[in-house]
Amino acid sequence: MSFRDQPLGELALSIPRASALFRKYDMDYCCGGKQTLARAAARKELDVEAIEAELAQLAEQPIEKDWRTAPLAEIIDHIIVRYHDRHREQLPELILQATKVERVHADKPSVPKGLAKYLTMLHQELSSHMMKEEQILFPMIKQGMGSQAMGPISVMESEHDDAGELLEVIKHTTNNVTPPPEACTTWKAMYNGINEMIDDLMEHISLENNVLFPRALAGE
């Protein structure tokens, strides 16, 4: 089956573990979820046929939950518990770890300078963003007023783009979240946590941008 003309966001939702595959190749399936696989591969100078072959293998596995057809209220409840609450736990701990690593290893050329600052910025942006969703947008959608939420949704999508840009800065600061050979246990644990946070945030944004928001605007 050919996947190259399908949007990344759709593939990430319909094929188990496709999101992890796209992350491996640094392909943006959340904020850039509307671009086709062929276009995304061309931009990264990747072999689209090889990626299609990997997707074909993944597509043979059963999908755990197809959020594309789930009720909107169920999607919202899932987003809050699985992503919003998780981000609120993850980021303060990562900020503490980054502050410690930057202080203890300040003399090492490989130290991720500015990481605590960028994680703090992401934490502040997401805290405000998630509160607006939970207090304003999500109740509108649950009350069947999603088709009238074009303004709030466009703001949320813009803030998703801002978060995506901060993730790119964090990846650049951390050598694509790769610890150097001399990294201590805290440093390695922090990078594992950052990778998990990035995976969670990309899945979170993808579910909103590619499923919840379009269906809400369509009047479901």
From Swiss-Prot:
GO terms for biological process: protein repair; response to nitrosative stress; response to oxidative stress. It comes from the Bacteria. The keyword Chaperone does not apply. GO terms for cellular component: cytoplasm. The keyword Disulfide bond does not apply. Keywords: Cytoplasm, Iron, Metal-binding, Stress response. Homodimer. Belongs to the RIC family. YtfE subfamily. Di-iron-containing protein involved in the repair of iron-sulfur clusters damaged by oxidative and nitrosative stress conditions. This is Iron-sulfur cluster repair protein YtfE. It comes from Citrobacter koseri (strain ATCC BAA-895 / CDC 4225-83 / SGSC4696).
